[in-house]
C-alpha cells in the first residue's frame, strides 16, 4: 500500500488530470479560432441603402422648427451677399421632394452693363455657369455607387475604361517610382498625376509667349467631344507627376471620374435586370 502512495506522490488526483486536459483543449481551440479570425480577410459587409426619410416625409415650411431654420438661412445668405462685393448675383433655394420651401434671388443679372436699367435682376430662372461645381456631383455619385457595392475607391480606372492608358517617365528619380495603376481614389483626390487639361496646347514659344496655355480650344487644340478622344489624349502625354506624390488639379481626371460613374452604374443596374438601354 505504501509503495502505491509513493508512486502517486507529487501527481494530481486522476479527476484533476481530466480537468487539466479539458482546460488545455479549450484554450487551444480558442487560440486557434482567434488566430484564424485575425489572419483571415474580413468578409465584405452588406451596405444597406440610406433611408429615404425625406422623400416620404417631406419638410413643411410652416413647421416652427423648419420656419426658424429657414429664417436663419435667409439671414446668412443675405448677409454673405452684402459682405462680399465680388458676388454679382446669386440664387439660393432649399428644395424638398415636394418642391422648394425657400427661395431668394439677389443682385443684377448682367452686372457689367453700364446702364442700370439694362442690368435686369436675378430670378429663379437665371442661368449660371456651373463650372467646377459639377465635380461635387460626380464625387457624390461615386460615393453612392460605392455604398451600393457597384465600385470600390481603389479599383483601377482600366476596370471600367479598358481603353485607358497613361505614360510614366520624365522624372529625375524615375527608377524609384512605383508604376502602379491609377485608381478611382487618385482621380477623386487629384492625386493621379494628370495635368489639368487634355489635349495640351503647343507652348514652343514659352516663356516669350503664352500661346498654347489653358484648356482646349483656347490653347489651340481641339476640344475632345467624346470619351475616346479624352482617353487617347491622356495616353499621348506623360503624367505631370508620379501618381500619389502631390495633388495636381485635373479637369481631365474628373471627366474620367464621371465616365466611370456612368459605366459602374450601368453595370450595377444591368445586374439587377434594369434595361439600361431605355
Swiss-Prot record:
GO CC annotation terms, alphabetical: membrane
Which GO molecular function annotation, any one, does this entry have? hydrolase activity
Which InterPro entries does the annotation name? Beta-lactam-related, Beta-lactam/transpept-like, Beta-lactamase-like_AB/R
| EC class | hydrolase
As for membrane topology, the entry says: Single-pass membrane protein
One Pfam family this chain carries?
Answer: Beta-lactamase
Q: Please tell me whether the keyword Transmembrane is annotated for this protein.
A: yes
Its protein name is Beta-lactamase-like protein str5
What organism is this sequence from?
Answer: Strobilurus tenacellus
Amino acid at each position: 500500500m505504501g509503495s502505491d502512495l509513493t508512486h502517486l506522490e507529487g501527481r494530481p488526483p486522476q479527476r484533476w488530470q481530466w480537468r487539466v486536459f479539458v482546460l488545455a483543449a479549450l484554450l487551444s481551440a480558442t487560440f486557434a479560432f482567434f488566430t484564424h479570425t485575425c489572419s483571415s480577410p474580413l468578409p465584405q459587409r452588406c451596405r444597406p441603402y440610406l433611408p429615404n426619410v425625406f422623400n416620404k416625409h417631406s419638410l413643411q415650411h410652416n413647421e416652427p422648427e423648419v420656419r426658424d431654420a429657414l429664417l436663419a438661412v435667409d439671414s446668412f445668405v443675405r448677409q454673405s451677399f452684402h459682405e462680399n462685393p465680388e458676388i454679382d448675383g446669386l440664387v439660393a433655394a432649399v428644395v424638398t421632394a415636394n418642391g422648394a420651401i425657400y427661395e431668394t434671388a439677389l443682385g443684377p443679372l448682367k452686372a457689367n452693363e453700364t446702364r442700370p436699367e439694362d442690368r435686369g435682376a436675378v430670378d429663379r430662372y437665371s442661368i449660371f455657369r456651373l463650372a467646377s461645381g459639377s465635380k461635387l456631383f460626380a464625387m457624390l455619385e461615386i460615393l453612392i455607387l460605392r455604398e451600393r457595392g457597384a465600385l470600390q475607391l481603389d479599383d483601377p480606372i482600366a476596370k471600367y475604361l479598358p481603353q485607358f492608358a497613361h505614360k510614366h517617365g520624365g522624372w529625375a528619380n524615375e527608377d524609384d517610382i512605383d508604376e502602379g495603376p491609377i485608381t478611382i481614389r487618385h482621380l477623386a483626390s487629384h492625386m493621379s498625376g494628370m495635368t489639368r487639361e487634355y489635349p495640351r496646347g503647343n507652348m514652343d514659344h514659352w516663356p516669350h509667349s503664352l500661346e498654347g496655355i489653358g484648356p482646349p480650344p483656347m490653347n489651340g487644340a481641339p476640344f475632345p467631344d467624346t470619351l475616346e478622344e479624352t482617353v487617347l489624349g491622356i495616353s499621348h502625354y506623360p503624367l505631370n507627376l508620379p501618381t500619389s506624390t502631390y495633388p495636381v488639379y485635373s479637369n481631365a481626371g474628373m471627366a474620367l471620374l464621371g465616365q466611370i460613374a456612368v459605366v459602374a452604374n450601368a453595370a450595377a443596374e444591368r445586374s439587377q435586370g434594369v434595361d439600361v438601354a431605355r
